[in-house]
Amino acid sequence: GNSAANGSTASGFECYPAVPGRTWHQESFYFAQLLAKGMQAVGASLRGRGGVRYIYYLENDQKQLVESTHTEVRAERSFTLLEDVNCPAVLAEQCFVTNEADVAQFGSEEGCKKTARVYYEAICAYFGTQPQAEQLAGFTLN
């Protein structure tokens, strides 16, 4: 999860795909959209426009958040884990640990299972496979 400064009311899900102009941008953006839609479906509020944003580091080491609607190619680097990879990559922050409502919704065992299911289904959708039904205590959940 993410954290915010004391007194902040920040909450919700956001994720960062590889930025425009990078080799894996399109694939990363597609996967980020799958994650955001899945998290919204289980009740997460989405930060920004649709929960998908880009982040850049400026010359003075300050971060700049940019909505995913801004698709111009920029020279600034993003997170290293999104830059120095040989595959699609997305950094996801599914909640704010400093927000009581986020923690209540996603900090429990049930919330973690819901989130894990979203990630699993997004991975299956990305690869074009059908997810297996979830098995819990002898019951099948879809």
Protein language model features and the residues they cover:
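Active-site-proximal helix/loop segments of hydrolytic enzymes
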Residues: 1-142
